[in-house]
Amino acid sequence: MIAPTLLGHIGAVSGANVSVRQFEGLSSGIAIIGGRSYRIGQVGSFVRIPQGYHDLFGVIAEVGASATPETLRDATNRGDRWMTVQLVGESVGVSFERGISQYPAINDEVHLVTDDDLANIYGDEGTGQVVVGRLAGAESIEVRVDLDKLVTRHSAVLGSTGSGKSTTVASLLTSIAGNGVTPPTFPSSRILLLDIHGEYASALRDVATVFRVNPGEGQEPLHIPYWAIGVSELLTFLMGKVDDKAVTSILDRIIADKMNLIETQVFAGVDANALTADSPLPFSLKQLWFDLIDPEIRTYLDDARTNPALVEAGDPALLRANRYQPATSTNSAPYINRQNVLSIKRQLDQMKSRLLDRQFDFMLHPGAWEPALDGQTEADLPELLERWLGSEKPITILDLSGVPSTVLEHLIGGILNIVYEALVWGRDTPEGGRQRPLLVVMEEAHRYLGRDSDSLARDMVQRIVKEGRKFGVGAMIVSQRPSEIDETILSQCGTFVSLRLSNAADRGKVQAALPDSLSGLIDSLPILRTGEAIITGEAALLPIRCRIALPPENRRPSSEDPSVSKAWSNERADSNYARPVAAWRAQNAQFTIEGDDDGTSTG
């Protein structure tokens, strides 16, 4: 008796690809099995190939003339219907494994996979599994991913604008960290989310602590101390281009300032003999500026240059330089200084402008982490890491929407450097990465992880995806333009959550990086529905087409498009463009003018 699930028989085997001649008795595109209807020959659907004590599983990649084996394309039986199936795994009993131990033989039967078969594969509710959604073709079946491999082997969430990336990320993180109401499955989970557009604060407010440049109600101020990030990148940001000789002198002065600090204050683990400019110790930028500007402007009353022509003493705390009598153009007093001059006055003027620019206060004047002129600070790096990684809530959101684009790459690199170095070197402590792993989620990754980028951010993420597995630090890359992301980073991602991708270059990038060679599934990326994804890689038992579980509407990211027709249908209201200009000048979208009656809080 012919089984109702029979689709056809194997006609050719080539590596992971199998050509299947469809059963002639299939007169319809729909099969009724166990009271349920199944579409036959759908690209992306699963098939089962019985092999005695175990079954092979594959995914339909092609259907029709293009699926006909090359050796048969000129044969007389061109009327046969063919499918190309790509093998992905096998099962023994109820245990499923990726990969195959043997190939099928010619004329082996190929069967449709029923909901019961899928339930056996995806029904494992063992430890370390998190629900991400439901099968697109069988929505009664939950889809789970392996949390261990999702984090330690890294992952990428990719999709065009409007495909549902932000909602997918929010859903994934909620599945891991809980919803703030029911007890979480993973109460010690630790997730750091770099939120470039400020989308996630409302969606994850029950399970996340939010740090923001201009904090709103229930949010914390974001402080990123400049002295804890790379000095070379910091000097480039502050001063622009400086010749190598001057840079060396500046670095020597920074080292001297740090040496003076450790003589008066004890920092555990600091070895004076191994101190460098990049050692994460405080130093005062104001004092550095004052010390560097003075030789550039100093004049003397005597030709021996021993008596400075000082008019008024300056104040480094106020960024006010010493004032001297101007030098003459003739060979007479006051004489210009010729000692320790680096010829960097223009660069120092730029540095002063940066230090006075309010939009950089979160980094250059970082609250309790801002050094006094002698380098002393109220708080140190342990307090900073405690705020970022030791919060009672499992997710920490660093909202970078108020960060100027000129410093974004440098800043993200600095954040990752602080976190990664601490967790790697402290890997065997209870706070380290091996004892309590960390997942770093990077939104809009193409903006700072580009192929041509030479930034600290790209270097740090390359380190994380190459080495992080050993130290308990995982990366989740989120992007709408995978073709612009550095190849090394994308190729190290073990799991891909691919939403709708319309751009051919982006699809090609995904296909080249995927651990499973599934061209048929990749070809379906442009026609995925919003919120629908193809999940493939190490965290997924099988490559699957999945409907991501949507959070409630009041728990979704603030990334939805405005309703143009609805907004334009409203009656015109009185305009007051002083409000957007004030918010712009304050670099704070929540800012409002004193006495304004729009209901928002006053900045």
Please describe what each predicted stretch is.
Residues 240, 457, 463-547:
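Conserved ATP-driven motor cores of ASCE-family P-loop NTPases powering translocation/secretion/packaging/pilus
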Residues 247-270, 523-554:
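Conserved AAA+ ATPase small/helical "lid" subdomain
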Residues 129-214, 487, 535, 565-567, ...:
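Glycine-rich phosphate-binding loop of nucleotide-binding enzymes
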Residues 194, 442, 478-479:
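Hydrophobic residues in beta-strands of the RecA-like P-loop NTPase core, especially within AAA+ ATPase
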Residues 1-159, 167-168, 172, 178-182, ...:
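Basic- and hydrophobic-enriched, low-structure N-terminal and domain-boundary segments
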Residues 212-216, 223-228, 496-505:
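Conserved AAA+ ATPase "SRH/arginine-finger" region at the nucleotide-binding site
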Residues 198-208, 227-460:
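P-loop NTPase motor domains
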Residues 303, 310-313, 317-321, 327, ...:
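Conserved P-loop NTPase motor module
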